[in-house]
C-alpha cells in the first residue's frame, strides 16, 4: 500500500467489528510510532493511557461524544464500539500546550492503525470527569482520545457541495465532503 492509499484508508470510523479485539501490545506498537515523531522543541510532553479491556472501554465510551453533527443518531451503534482507545495526555509539568504534537501523534497512530487493517476516530468531546475516573494524576491533561478497532461502516469521500463541509449519512453510508484541491491552494492550482 502506497502512502496515498494509506491516507485514503484512514477515515474517521464510528462503528467497529465487535469480533476483532485489540491487544495491549498492538496499542503499544502504535504509541511507539507516535513516540518517534517530531516534537516541538523536542520536549516530548505527551503521555498515553491505553485501554483494551471492556470495562475501561465502556467507561471511556460513556464519557465521550461522537459525531456531533449527526444529531438524530447515536454513535457508535449499540454493540459496535471500539476495541480499544489511546488517551493522549499532555504532561503539564513539561508543557502547558502541545496541540501540534497531539495532532502529529494522533495522525501517526491512525496511519499505523490503517496499515494494520484497523480504523480509528479522533475524539475531542470528552467529559472532564473522565480524568479522575481514569485515575490520572493532576499533571496529566487529556487532550484527545483515539478510538481503535476494525471498521464496520461504509465511508465515502465526496467533493463539497458549495461551502458545506458537514459530514452526513444516507442509508448505511457515511459521506465525508472534502474541498477540492483548487479551493484550498491560496496561490492557485496546477494548470
Language-model regions, residue ranges each:
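Acidic, surface-exposed loops and disordered segments
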Residues: 1-191
